[in-house]
Amino acid sequence: MKNVDYKLYLVTDRKVLKERDLYKSIEEAIKGGVTLVQLREKEMSTLDFYESALKLKKITETYKIPLIINDRIDIALAINADGVHIGQSDMPLIKARELLGKDKIIGVSAHSIEEALEAERNGATYLGVGAIYNTSTKGDAQAVSLEELKNIKNSVKIPVVGIGGINEENANKVIETGVDGISVISGILSAQKIKDKARVMFDIVKKNSTK
């Protein structure tokens, strides 16, 4: 897929939403400026994940933004999602690319220049680099400083997205490193007015972007 806008990358987490409806919340976030959505549900059955992905795909297609599936290549293939995001301990990138084909988006988590360069060599579409700040949604996240984020961005040619604990207060510092976008969970989904918060975050990215 060409010309993907990584500016404001929303990752789902039902725990953050609590009792609020996932699909309405995601739609509100998209209306506020989210440019990319990743369905990430680690504790869901395959059937529930599949059905959730199908519902979410209808929304993302309506607004013409990509839907990325976290880890589950089988689900991505089953619903013809725009791509997947995989971590360092998930299926090898080369095998994922073989299964998905050359046109699908494949994002890879990276925590160092070495991991970033290897992912780029093996065909990653973009990199998710972090955690930049402490995050409650991924307790085992490896820390990456802003300086390291900047160095990783400067070492590769593919897009880089900063991830981990990014919110309204610190988003500008992340964007100023030169990255292509920020990945947000709680920074948007924990807000009472999700659409308004997404708009604030989008404006911060746009204002501070070096691109």
Swiss-Prot record:
Binds 1 Mg(2+) ion per subunit. Pfam families: TMP-TENI. Its cofactor is Mg(2+). Pathway: Cofactor biosynthesis; thiamine diphosphate biosynthesis; thiamine phosphate from 4-amino-2-methyl-5-diphosphomethylpyrimidine and 4-methyl-5-(2-phosphoethyl)-thiazole: step 1/1. 2-[(2R,5Z)-2-carboxy-4-methylthiazol-5(2H)-ylidene]ethyl phosphate binds at residues 135-137, 165, 185-186. The keyword Cell wall biogenesis/degradation does not apply. Keywords: Magnesium, Metal-binding, Thiamine biosynthesis, Transferase. GO terms for biological process: thiamine biosynthetic process; thiamine diphosphate biosynthetic process. InterPro entries: Aldolase_TIM, ThiamineP_synth_sf, ThiamineP_synth_TenI, TMP_synthase. The keyword Magnesium applies. PANTHER family: THIAMINE BIOSYNTHETIC BIFUNCTIONAL ENZYME, THIAMINE-PHOSPHATE PYROPHOSPHORYLASE. Condenses 4-methyl-5-(beta-hydroxyethyl)thiazole monophosphate (THZ-P) and 2-methyl-4-amino-5-hydroxymethyl pyrimidine pyrophosphate (HMP-PP) to form thiamine monophosphate (TMP). This is Thiamine-phosphate synthase. The lineage of its organism: Bacteria, Bacillati, Bacillota, Clostridia, Eubacteriales.
